[in-house]
Amino acid sequence: MVLEVPSITPGELHDLMRLHQDAEWPECKKMFPWAHDISFGQPPDFPHSLAIVKSQSDANNSALLRNSLEVNDIFQSWKVRTSFHREGDTCETGNDSNGFQYPNNTKELLNLLKFQIRQLELQVDDVALENAATYCHNHSILPFLKVDPRGLSLELKRYSRNKVGSNTTLKRSGQDVWGRRGLFRRFDLQCAKMIEMVDNIVIYCSRTGGSTDMQTESAPACSHEGNCPNCTTLALLLQICLMFVQKGYVGSGGSLYKTNLFICTYQNFNTDIPQTLIGTPLLDNEFFKNNTPLNLCSSPSEIVCFNNVDKNMVLCEKLELNKLTSATRLEETGLICGNTTDWHNYQIIKKNNISLTHRFEENTSIVNLKSLNYDTDNPTTSISQLYNIPNTKEVWKLIIKCTSNSQMPSLTKIRTYLDLLLDDDASKSQEHLHLTFPASGSIGLGNLNIQSVEILLNVCYLIFQVSQVQELLTFMYCEDGYTETSLLLTAYIIFHFNIPLQDALLRIHPRPFFLFPSDLQILGHLQPVLREFSPQNGSNLKLYANALKFRDKSFQLHISSELFSSIFFMKIPLESNFVNLKGPLPSRILRHLYLGSLDHAQNPALLKSLGITHIVSVGEVVSWTLNKDKIAHPVRPHRAITMTNTNEVAGNTTCNKSRNRADTVVSDKQENGSNVVISENSGFQICQIENLDDNGKDPLFHQIDKVLDFISNSEATGGKVLVHCMVGVSRSATVCIAECMRYLQCDLASAYLFVRVRRLNVIIQPNLFFVYELFKWWKKHYNREKDKTMDWHIICRGIAEVNMKYT
């Protein structure tokens, strides 16, 4: 077989893209359960569908078409001699009928390709096949689509470790697909699923003549011909892999291959290809050598990445979090909380004496930020829009960095800083006073002793005294701007205002914070001590003022052994709405919208203290809304469902890991018939979505307009809504994403990130079915700029990328 791949012009590609954009994506009932699993059966029909694949990546990620894929998105990765390779293990598949083993070099890759060719009864030129094996070697891929069960059997034999959302049991029947655990979040498969489903595949690259290097002229020439070896080899590989996966379909009854393959040719990438098709233009190397004097970005490539919506979800998550947690002053305290980027930018601006307008708005976001032009003469104009610029007119004197590997500062160091503060010359100098402090979640009640409590008290005292010196402020920060600073921040708010822990959390809540159960326990026991030394007590304030006025360098706070002992006998009031929670407070997504768990909804006093007036219960029943006859069965008595391994959302979380969410096992015997019931109870308006489970098949969006109308009516009357399910990561997160799409008039990817970032350390995980419903709903109601539409598989690729660090 000699594969002849026709060439198409950029204009013809544009026509194919228009047909694809106008095409109707398959209905949910046809897309699923096929999209959930590796491929045992035929894909749904999707007439006029198009996938674009780049055959050769560029080092600087330029020359990218919109909605285009790369080979690593489609093919299974090839890992050679990893730590999982046991000595003497031949890595055979365990299924002798497959007749192949895991390849460890190009020759074995070639043998694997030859095996596939024999199975398909094809005749392929030896040179072409050798080129395909070399291509696989160069790109570290196996000649299998990610959805091919036989390719996965190779990987599973040598790499048996489970990953979040992955399935390690291969079965030939699709009948049990709904019952398999962890299967309904395979976003990583959807690019390969798209390749398997589409009618047309267009291949391109930025290869110029005989070299894959870019031209260096300011307007790089990039002539791309139909005989490009990269593109023709990829076309052959795609044809073999598509036919091979189709051969494994259950009950296919013959050849199904129907995909049209094309290679796009052009003389100049930037001028020949319509601008609506270009995600990132071909850029010369000089562009990437320019550096901003602010150094806010590592290179101008971040501006390029931001402008390409197809490839920027990881970057946008970082930028959105930076905006959300940027430096803000807490009321009248003299304490500013922020993130590492704030401190970095503050130093750069001050050091270089750069005149840059302070930019900060509460609830600021990059969601509606348009494409940025990179001005080499004035780079800060565009780059500064990606960040909230700190106010460098403020004097940040005391700098406190909280990290997980920090020890408590010594009392001697704190006293030294107090001495410097009392020295006129030292206090007016530009030199900063630096402290480190242990991160939230790193101290347990059993770690406390008199010295550690005194250190915490004196750090709070130092922050207060810095604020009493004219124009001096304290900047407290950590990497993400909230996780590691929350313990010290909350302790200081209790100390400064002389308020109980519950009220302190309410004061902080407009700003992101996250307290671990151990933090709540410590603060609950320490709050009497912190309040006893609060400057809000008249005698304390006078004492602290005199220490500053008379330059008493020996003054420090001390506690008696009796007071220390009383800490451990202190009981947290049972009526405390916040401290007895098993996790964090509900996450504020918008001014009128909160996302939380069933635990939050079960606590009406907590909701009232947050100003919440409306509740949306997604598939769960709040016990206090039931009459006494029903309280014995508070959770969906009408559904055959078992919740296992709930592992409460804040229980076992570390700073860098996500929580495990509840696994759901659902009987197939009952069809979903969800409905919406609106009622009033105990002063709350309640919207109950009944009979909806997180099982990868229950539909939500036939009810979504009713739910969003309920939320909209609440917002119009000045109310606030809590949306919850069991844990607050899938069903309720889906509703919140839909509300953000409606309220912010943004696309699905932007709304997903907006909610994800504001859920803080609780990682949202809407199942694949819900996200596809969101996609279809957005296409129907809000897809006004089709040229900028992000395809389903591209959105899934982005979600898989931002979730990668948790797998």
From Swiss-Prot:
Keywords assigned by UniProt, alphabetized: Cell cycle, Hydrolase, Protein phosphatase
Location of the Tyrosine-protein phosphatase domain: 585-783
InterPro entries the UniProt entry points to: Dual-sp_phosphatase_cat-dom, Dual_spec_PTase, PPS1_DSP, Prot-tyrosine_phosphatase-like, Tyr_Pase_AS, Tyr_Pase_dom, TYR_PHOSPHATASE_DUAL_dom
Record's GO cellular component terms: nucleus
Catalytic activity field: O-phospho-L-tyrosyl-[protein] + H2O = L-tyrosyl-[protein] + phosphate; O-phospho-L-seryl-[protein] + H2O = L-seryl-[protein] + phosphate; O-phospho-L-threonyl-[protein] + H2O = L-threonyl-[protein] + phosphate
One GO MF term: protein serine/threonine phosphatase activity
Tagged with keyword Cell division: no
Region (Catalytic): 593-807
Top EC group: hydrolase
Gene3D superfamilies per UniProt: Protein tyrosine phosphatase superfamily (3.90.190.10)
Family membership noted in the UniProt record: Belongs to the protein-tyrosine phosphatase family. Non-receptor class dual specificity subfamily.
Function of the protein: Protein phosphatase with specificity for serine, threonine, and tyrosine residues; has a role in the DNA synthesis phase of the cell cycle.
Protein name, per record: Dual specificity protein phosphatase PPS1
Species of provenance: Saccharomyces cerevisiae (strain ATCC 204508 / S288c) (Baker's yeast)
